[in-house]
Amino acid sequence: MATTRYEPVAEIGVGAYGTVYKARDPHSGHFVALKSVRVPNGGAAGGGLPVSTVREVALLRRLEAFEHPNVVRLMDVCATSRTDRDIKVTLVFEHIDQDLRTYLDKAPPPGLPVETIKDLMRQFLSGLDFLHANCIVHRDLKPENILVTSNGTVKLADFGLARIYSYQMALTPVVVTLWYRAPEVLLQSTYATPVDMWSVGCIFAEMFRRKPLFCGNSEADQLGKIFDLIGLPPEDDWPREVSLPRGAFSPRGPRPVQSVVPEMEESGAQLLLEMLTFNPLKRISAFRALQHSYLHKEESDPE
């Protein structure tokens, strides 16, 4: 059994994708993160992995060959146990001690310097642009799966896992936060890579605020909080055949970004609004956001 070569050290946490363990590779001395998932038995002779899982893992392996600096390393994949119904697969990732949530919490008041935020955003967008260029939609970006190394390198984690984990998640329902979800996801409409850019906008604002931007407790409540900032979108932008009609929300106009992120200068506020654009077809892409002037000019120092 391949995972026996790793010595468990501690349980890191439990998330949408099951329990994550910190372990040590005795051969190299390096720490790794172990994520186990149950997938349905493929039903092939010998009960192999389902084709969909093999395909998803192959995609993660292919991405690994690029060694993108802002994407967490996948070191190994091993099938560890099986029953008649399912197979337990363990994904072995490089281990990084802190996520963006911890990193933000550790920053002394008044929070991160603007130049640090810009550097984090450039790295974050670079990793995301790489995933999108390879047709991977993350679907669950939040501060907890954006990792930050001790030298300030940003690495995206938990991408490409949504389909691998669909079977296990159906078996073990979990409460997934709505706070970083794009409107089209909240409305149960079709979605693609722009959903991630909405999440980026929420996280960008949170780097300044040090608290989440939209904290809804249901899909409708979350949408209401979004419209309190960006205004109720025009009828033409409302997707067809979705879970909630536009008429369910009272008309309201947009508020200035500085009313919720007062520390953000005008150019940053403009970039944020391009990320928090209701219509996904009009939302800025990771590639275009990387070119935005805000991320490339030095902050004017008032002192």
Curated annotation (Swiss-Prot):
Keyword Zinc tagged: no
Modified residues (N-acetylalanine): A2
Species the sequence originates in: Rattus norvegicus (Rat)
EC number of the protein: 2.7.11.22
Enzyme class per UniProt: transferase
Active site: D140 (proton acceptor)
Reaction(s) the record says it catalyses: L-seryl-[protein] + ATP = O-phospho-L-seryl-[protein] + ADP + H(+); L-threonyl-[protein] + ATP = O-phospho-L-threonyl-[protein] + ADP + H(+)
Protein name from the UniProt record: Cyclin-dependent kinase 4
Any one of the GO BP annotations: regulation of cell cycle
Subunit structure: Component of the D-CDK4 complex, composed of CDK4 and some D-type G1 cyclin (CCND1, CCND2 or CCND3). Interacts directly in the complex with CCND1, CCND2 or CCND3. Interacts with SEI1 and ZNF655. Forms a ternary complex, cyclin D-CDK4-CDKN1B, involved in modulating CDK4 enzymatic activity. Interacts directly with CDKN1B (phosphorylated on 'Tyr-88' and 'Tyr-89'); the interaction allows assembly of the cyclin D-CDK4 complex, Thr-172 phosphorylation, nuclear translocation and enhances the cyclin D-CDK4 complex activity.
InterPro entries hit by this protein: CDK, Kinase-like_dom_sf, Prot_kinase_dom, Protein_kinase_ATP_BS, Ser/Thr_kinase_AS
Coiled coil start-end: none
Record comment: activity regulation: Both phosphorylation at Thr-172 and binding of a D-type cyclin are necessary for enzymatic activity. Full activation of the cyclin-D-CDK4 complex appears to require other factors such as recruitment of the substrate via a substrate recruitment motif, and/or formation of the CDKN1B ternary complex. Inhibited by INK4 family members. In resting cells, the non-tyrosine-phosphorylated form of CDKN1B prevents phosphorylation at Thr-172 and inactivation, while, in proliferating cells, tyrosine phosphorylation of CDKN1B allows phosphorylation of Thr-172 of CDK4 and subsequent activation.
